[in-house]
A protein has these predicted regions:
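Immediate flanking context of iron-sulfur cluster ligation sites
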Residues: 64-74, 111
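Short, glycine/acidic-enriched capping/hinge loops at junctions between secondary-structure elements
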Residues: 55-57, 69, 82
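Alpha-helical support elements that line or immediately flank enzyme active sites
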Residues: 78, 82-93
């Protein structure tokens, strides 16, 4: 008898075997902050050394609080999970508070990703910071 495994279960097992923590896997599978924002207040893009491309969309509300953030990503599971975790860390914060997040903060949320994917966390944070800094500069 052959047991069927869902695609999600198969991906979860593959990512776990590769060294991704449960939160990182969930972020990757759910991709809840993927996409773009119509009429975004700021759009910024970075290309990682590995060739991954991240574009961040920011919607900023009253008193410089971040109302919404979305990423469009051409990249691996590490890039996607890192970007999704970064959104959870900045959403609802002020621009200045959001600029305080760092690679270590994102890593803690993800719990674990393979060492060879740590650059993905750096890319997610740098892309976010670039967007936040550009917003501040353009709206000073």
């Amino acid at each position: 008898m052959v047991t069927e495994i869902s695609t999600s279960d198969a991906e979860r097992k593959m990512l776990s075997d590769a060294g991704y923590g449960d939160p990182a896997i969930t972020y990757y599978l759910e991709k809840k902050y993927m996409g773009h924002i119509e009429n975004a207040d700021q759009v910024s893009e970075k290309i990682g050394s590995c060739g991954d491309i991240m574009r961040v969309y920011l919607k900023v509300g009253d008193n410089n609080f971040i109302d919404d953030v979305r990423y469009e990503i051409t990249g691996c599971a590490g890039a996607i999970s890192a970007a999704m975790a970064a959104v959870d860390l900045v959403k609802g914060k002020t621009i200045d508070d959001a600029l305080e997040i760092n690679d270590g903060d994102v890593f803690k949320v993800l719990e674990n990703i393979p060492e060879k994917k740590h650059h993905c966390i750096q890319l997610a944070v740098k892309t976010m910071h670039q967007g936040l800094e550009s917003y501040k500069k353009n709206n000073a």
